[in-house]
């Protein structure tokens, strides 16, 4: 069954970079994406990009200008996979769009891309797993790698055979940003970034939410501020907006 995995605002003059679960990158200009209404079904992304039938888009980034050499050589694309692997590559490596896409990261057979973020080289990273734990570390702990590299261990998962990463966030302003997590049954929790002690990458992290049968497993982690409105969308497409 199809469901929404991410959402965001788009500037028609910007370029969207789409990343698939198998680790490929594709490009579209925002104005090339058909505009719809609140209740319309939308267009299948496979009809707009040359994506393999057994692959799917799991993340995207918006970039205004891939020709700005200063920008693309001072920003990075940060990948996180289901199994806790993290990879950091210079944005410049993805600045030459190709119709059939390019390999953005080498993914092992039992893994998939679940989150992609753009960083400035000085962000803090928080990764969360299904079992309600989160790890915080500085992105300098992740060395820059080539476009097709596999990556390094970002978080160690529980050995219960069911644990996996559900999200990764990049913190740009620890003074104003807070952490929001949401569980399968719609329970949410907001907490200060300082509740998550800084550690080295690759650890198991600290508890971010108490997981019970009532709450269900964790499904997402986001950074939010007091000025943000929150929109939570379930698998049926029902949207709830919160202040």
Question: What spans do the regions from the language model cover?
Answer:
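Conserved structured catalytic cores and adjacent interaction surfaces
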Residues: 4, 57, 61-209, 213-242
């Amino acid at each position: 069954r199809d469901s929404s995995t991410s959402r965001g605002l788009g500037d028609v003059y910007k370029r969207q970079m789409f990343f698939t679960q198998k680790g490929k990158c594709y490009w579209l200009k925002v104005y090339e994406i058909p505009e719809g209404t609140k209740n319309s079904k939308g267009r299948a992304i496979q009809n707009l990009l040359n994506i393999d039938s057994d692959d799917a888009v799991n993340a995207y980034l918006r970039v205004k200008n891939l020709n700005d050499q200063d920008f693309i050589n001072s920003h990075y694309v940060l990948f996180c996979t289901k199994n806790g692997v993290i990879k950091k590559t210079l944005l410049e490596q993805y600045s030459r769009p190709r119709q059939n896409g390019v390999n953005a990261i080498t993914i092992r057979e039992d893994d998939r891309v679940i989150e992609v973020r753009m960083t400035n080289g000085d962000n803090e990273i928080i990764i969360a797993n299904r079992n309600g734990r989160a790890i915080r570390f500085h992105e300098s702990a992740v060395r820059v790698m080539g476009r097709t590299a596999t990556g390094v261990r970002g978080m160690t998962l529980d050995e219960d055979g069911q644990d996996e990463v559900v999200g990764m966030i990049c913190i740009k302003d620890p003074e104003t940003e807070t952490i929001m997590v949401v569980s399968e049954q719609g329970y949410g929790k907001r907490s200060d970034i300082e509740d998550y002690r800084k550690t080295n990458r690759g650890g198991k992290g600290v508890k971010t939410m108490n997981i019970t049968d009532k709450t269900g497993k964790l499904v997402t982690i986001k950074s939010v501020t007091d000025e943000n409105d929150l929109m939570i969308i379930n698998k049926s497409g029902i949207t709830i907006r919160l202040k």
